[in-house]
Curated annotation (Swiss-Prot):
Gene Ontology MF, one: protein kinase activator activity
Annotated GO CC locations: cytoplasm; medial cortex; new mitotic spindle pole body; nucleus; old mitotic spindle pole body; Sid2-Mob1 complex
Signal sequence region: none
Protein name: Probable maintenance of ploidy protein mob1
Gene Ontology BP term (one): cell division
Sequence similarity: Belongs to the MOB1/phocein family.
Length: 219
């Protein structure tokens, strides 16, 4: 599966588009560059807070695009290790298999290999980001009333990519030297969801619940 292009949007804090790198997706060097620019240092709890005077929907939009880019690059770094043969189902642990459903092509929950699921997911998120009716490209244009609910759904679905990577590709992440970047990116994701009440229930974190609890206690 070819790597996705990182979204460039006026709301993206770091406008970074990785070069195409073939089957292997984003390179480790690219990911390190982006992580250093995006994550920085200091308390991640402070990073995720709504800045004084900032519109909440604008802040949700900025971070949604940024996390899409981070997940895109993390998964892009390990795509050659995630195939229909190695990952015939989109799973975290055996208890958590994710089925794809949308309003156009898959109106019923559909089982598919992890790469196909993730491609559908990232294309769906990209489609929402590119939709002017959902995410106006000009800052100051009002968001639709349905935007907060859509953001919750997007964050819930993007979490599944983190869960799949942690449960099925963590050894490869360590071999590539990307463990700190995965952990920092995911911790920021967890803290952002916690800060802005985006979790949709007590079972939201499922297979990574213990890791999430640890991250919430440590910041």
């Amino acid at each position: 599966m070819s790597s996705f292009l990182t979204t460039v949007n006026q709301r993206t804090r770091n406008q970074f588009r990785p070069r195409a790198s073939g089957k292997g997706g984003a390179t480790s060097y690219q990911l390190r560059q982006y992580a250093e620019a995006t994550l920085g240092g200091g308390s991640l709890r402070k990073v995720v807070k709504l800045p004084e005077g900032e519109d909440e929907n604008e802040w949700l939009a900025v971070n949604m695009v940024d996390f899409y880019n981070q997940i895109n690059l993390l998964y892009g770094a390990i795509t050659e290790f995630c195939s229909p043969q190695t990952c015939p189902e989109m799973k975290a642990t055996d208890e958590f298999e994710y089925l794809w459903q949308d309003t156009e092509n898959y109106k019923r929950p559909t089982k598919m290999p992890a790469p196909a699921y993730i491609e559908q997911l990232m294309s769906w998120v990209q489609g929402n980001i590119d939709n002017e009716a959902v995410l106006p490209s000009r800052i100051g244009v009002p968001f639709p009333k349905s935007f907060p609910a859509l953001v919750r759904q997007i964050f819930k679905r993007m979490y599944r990519v983190y869960a799949h990577i942690y449960c099925h590709h963590y050894p490869v992440i360590r071999e590539l030297g990307l463990e700190p970047h995965l952990n920092t990116s995911f911790k920021q994701y967890v803290l952002f969801i916690d800060e802005h009440n985006l979790a949709t229930g007590k079972d939201f974190w499922g297979p990574l619940g213990d890791l999430v609890d640890s991250m919430l206690r440590s910041d």
